[in-house]
Swiss-Prot record:
Induction comment from the UniProt entry of this chain: By heat shock, and under other conditions of stress, such as increased salt concentration and starvation.
Main location: mitochondrion
Keyword match tRNA processing: no
Region forming the signal peptide: none
Keyword terms of this UniProt record: Mitochondrion, Stress response
GO cellular component: mitochondrion
Name used for this protein in its record: Heat shock 22 kDa protein, mitochondrial
Annotated function: May play a protective role against oxidative stress.
Species lineage: Eukaryota, Viridiplantae, Streptophyta, Embryophyta, Tracheophyta
Cellular compartments annotated: Mitochondrion
Protein family membership: Belongs to the small heat shock protein (HSP20) family.
Mitochondrion found in the keyword field: yes
Organism the protein comes from: Solanum lycopersicum (Tomato)
């Protein structure tokens, strides 16, 4: 999808949005992975293990 062009009705029908509920989960944002393959975006955000947490 190119944001520089006008969206067609076809593009609008194909757009999807998803929200994922995230409760008290710590994630490693610097280790996330985004892969676009055949028009499908796959997102992997690993959880931080309890012993790896650096917060106070």
């Amino acid at each position: 999808f190119n944001t520089n062009t006008q969206m067609t009705a076809y593009d609008q029908d194909r757009m999807x949005x998803x929200x994922l509920p995230v409760e008290n989960v710590r994630v490693a944002l610097e280790e996330n992975t985004l892969i676009m393959k055949n028009g499908v975006l796959k997102v992997a955000v690993p959880k931080v293990k309890q012993e790896e947490r650096k917060d106070v």
